[in-house]
Swiss-Prot record:
Top-level division of the source organism's lineage: Eukaryota
Gene (UniProt): FBXL5
Residue sites binding Fe(3+) 2 per the record: E58, E61, H80, H126, E130
A GO molecular-function descriptor: 2 iron, 2 sulfur cluster binding
The organism of origin for this protein: Homo sapiens
Residues annotated to bind [2Fe-2S] cluster: C662, C676, C686, C687
Protein name: F-box/LRR-repeat protein 5
Record text about domains: The hemerythrin-like region acts as an oxygen and iron sensor by binding oxygen through a diiron metal-center. In absence of oxygen and iron, the protein is ubiquitinated and degraded.
Hemerythrin-like: annotated segments: 1-159
Biological role: Component of some SCF (SKP1-cullin-F-box) protein ligase complex that plays a central role in iron homeostasis by promoting the ubiquitination and subsequent degradation of IREB2/IRP2. The C-terminal domain of FBXL5 contains a redox-sensitive [2Fe-2S] cluster that, upon oxidation, promotes binding to IRP2 to effect its oxygen-dependent degradation.
Localisation: Cytoplasm, Perinuclear region; Nucleus
Length: 691
């Protein structure tokens, strides 16, 4: 059917808006975490506003279209009598008023999804019927000029509620002191008494739908967002939307620079004056005595300013950790704390635990230690990380690199599914790389079998880089399978051995696997936990290959365009494909062509002089760093050429132009690498300092 002339098509334009709203609430419904009270209430408030607009739309159609058509045709009935909009609005009000805890939220969510799906199934065909049935009838019973007039009135009525010009006028009025005074002058009690009257006459910014408000908020900086969060409860919830807090720069914010876009100029070092000012601030802050009197301290004006800035930075960091990141942490992609005067290892540890999806982390020249990465002690808990800068972090040792490598996860296999193994030694610091095969005689065991059989003998990790692993001393491990839809509380697991849990099974795996040489290890994998990191990344895939020069027999891995097959390096047992199933951890997923772990592109350990060869080799575990292009090891005084060679062999994408290490080390690609960057540097470790 040919489309009707735009001038007399009374349904298409309003229906476009209604269909857009349907798409928006379907998308929000699929992304809402119903266990989170803030997400739950934000969804209901958005749905309530959406369905109020649906009701307004149908009231306009009844008055200006259907009502007129009924006057000229006796065959037209009340087409909006069974739309159930009032029932849906009552459902949302009930959820906002009566649902009090997580259990009730989850039960309500099931009912909500069913009701929304039923409504959507009816609402979309209803609009199609109006366009295909009633529009031709309008063309039959009304003249061209009459239809033009009807459409003009319909559009005008819709715009009287959500007209862009009116909204812009509301935004303009919002900036006037007179309107602000009018908004704030009423007390809470007076507001509640006059709420109905105000809502009837107001068409300002408070009536904007949430998606429009989020679009407006996206243009604001963090300081402005914090101010907006104090306007109302609705705005407070909207300003805690994750998309508004993707990039964090607390150090710059504390100094008045409120930039919050993507990280830029990644390789550019600040000038000497900027670094000196940051060091002066840090020194003044750490030497400052909080109990000292003004007369006693006798600080200069410059020192007072430095202390004030450092104090501001500390307060800002505490505010982020306690008031912002618990809500938006999973959405944070960039965190830059370079040259921070006040950040501590504890703060970094808390931030990293709340931000499992970080892609860019810059801790340049901060006073952190290995403990800052304690929250990264779990396999794959930050496997999206692409940029890590620890330049000048002099307290960092191999321990931190072990945690970092573990957090990057395990390289995904592109050809077959793998099953993760675990042993009883959870505190092990080395990874033992072993592929596993399924036993065909016994695949599943109930929970009580776990208490009757040993998990496996403890594997010696004292010399993990020189001692080959023998399969003779390794018994069959168990892999715990948890139903992701029925996770138990961690405290409940204490009683698991005393009762039967139907949703938990253990899978027994074979133990006849070994590597032809030393250097292939895998990390103990512990069970699922309630942490955000575990819930998102516990299903990291198995090793794709070891990536060490020990097992590569001199092969120049970094010159290859693709990663070699594991069979080319190690004699391993044949892998057994696992069937797809919701109770199995299956790694041959639909997204197997895209790596989900070990995607690091940039790594700088410049000035981390306590790093040794062991730390470099730890980075080669789990498949190495196949995407790494930039590696800065300037000032790492104790590493050797052998350790560098082992790391380089696991970094096939490394660019010599961005490969830096000490000039005194006879390492790989000595003729093409860029050498040391810390020569004559006043604030980074270097073997030639003082020359």
């Amino acid at each position: 059917m040919a489309p009707f002339p735009e001038e007399v098509d009374v349904f298409t334009a309003p229906h476009w808006r209604m269909k857009q709203l349907v798409g928006l609430y379907c998308d929000k419904l699929s992304k809402t975490n119903f266990s989170n009270n803030n997400d739950f209430r934000a969804l209901l408030q958005s749905l309530y506003a959406t369905f109020k607009e649906f009701k307004m739309h149908e009231q306009i159609e009844n008055e200006y279209i259907i009502g007129l058509l009924q006057q000229r045709s006796q065959t037209i009935y009340n087409v909006h009598s069974d739309n159930k909009l009032s029932e849906m609005l009552s459902l949302f009000e009930k959820g906002l008023k009566n649902v009090k805890n997580e259990y009730e939220q989850l039960n309500y969510a099931k009912q909500l999804k069913e009701r929304l799906e039923a409504f959507t199934r009816d609402f979309l065909p209803h609009m199609k019927e109006e366009e295909e049935v009633f529009q031709p009838m309008l063309m039959e019973y009304f003249t061209y000029e009459e239809l033009k007039d009807i459409k003009k009135k319909v559009i005008a009525q819709h715009c009287s509620q959500k007209d862009t010009a009116e909204l812009l006028r509301g935004l303009s009025l919002w900036n006037h002191a007179e309107e602000r005074q009018k908004f704030f002058k009423y007390s809470v009690d007076e507001k509640s008494d006059k709420e109905a009257e105000v809502s009837e006459h107001s068409t300002g910014i408070t009536h904007l739908p949430p998606e429009v408000m989020l679009s407006i908020f996206s243009y604001l900086n963090p300081q402005e967002l914090c101010r907006c969060s104090q306007v109302s409860m609705k705005w407070s919830q909207l300003t805690k939307t994750g998309s508004l807090w993707k990039h964090l720069y607390p150090v710059h914010w504390a100094r008045g620079d409120w930039y919050s876009g993507p990280a830029t100029e990644l390789d550019t070092e600040p000038d000497d004056e900027w670094v000196k000012n940051r060091k002066d601030e840090s020194r003044a802050f750490h030497e400052w005595d909080e109990d000292a009197d003004i007369d006693e301290s006798e600080e200069s004006a410059e020192e007072s300013i430095a202390i004030s800035i450092a104090q501001m930075e500390k307060r800002l960091l505490h505010g982020l950790i306690h008031n912002v990141l618990p809500y938006v942490g999973t959405s944070v992609k960039t965190l830059v704390l370079a040259y921070s005067s006040a950040v501590s290892s504890k703060m970094v540890r808390q931030i990293l635990e709340l931000c499992p999806n970080l892609e860019h982390l810059d801790l340049t020249q901060t006073d952190i230690s290995d403990s800052a990465f304690d929250s990264w002690s779990w396999l794959g808990c930050c496997q999206s990380l692409r940029h890590l800068d620890l330049s000048g972090c002099e307290k960092i040792t191999d321990v931190a690199l072990e945690k970092i490598s573990r957090a990057l996860g395990i390289l995904t296999s592109h050809q077959s599914g793998f099953l993760k193994t675990s042993t009883s030694k959870i505190t092990s610091t080395a990874w033992k790389n072993k592929d596993i095969t399924m036993q065909s005689t016994k695949q599943y065991a109930c929970l009580h079998d776990l208490t009757n059989k040993g998990i496996g003998e403890e594997i010696d990790n004292e010399h993990p880089w020189t001692k080959p692993v023998s399969s003779e001393n390794f018994t069959s491990p168990y892999v715990w399978m948890l139903d992701a839809e029925d996770l138990a509380d961690i405290e409940d697991t204490v009683e698991w051995r005393h009762r039967n849990v139907e949703s938990l099974c253990v899978m027994e795996t074979a133990s006849n696997f070994s590597c032809s040489t030393s250097g292939c290890f895998s990390k103990d994998i512990v069970g699922l936990r309630t942490s955000v990191c575990w819930q998102q990344h516990c299903a990291s895939p198995a090793f794709a290959y070891c990536g060490h020069s020990f097992c590569c027999t001199g092969t120049a891995l970094r010159t290859m365009s693709s990663l070699p097959e594991s069979s080319a390096m190690c004699r391993k047992a044949a892998r057994t494909r696992l069937p797809r199933g919701k109770d199995l951890i299956y790694f041959g997923s639909e997204k197997s062509d895209q790596e989900t772990g070990r995607v690091l592109l940039f790594l700088s350990l410049s000035g981390c002089y306590q790093i040794t060869d062991h730390g470099l080799r730890v980075l080669t575990l789990g498949g190495g760093l196949p995407y790494l292009e930039h590696l800065n090891l300037s000032g790492c005084l104790t590493i050797t050429g052998a350790g560098l060679q082992d790391l380089v062999s696991a970094c096939p994408s490394l660019n010599d132009e961005y490969f830096y290490y000490c000039d005194n080390i006879n390492g790989p690609h000595a003729d093409t690498a860029s050498g040391c960057q810390n020569l004559q540097c006043g604030f980074r470790a270097c073997c030639r300092s003082g020359e």
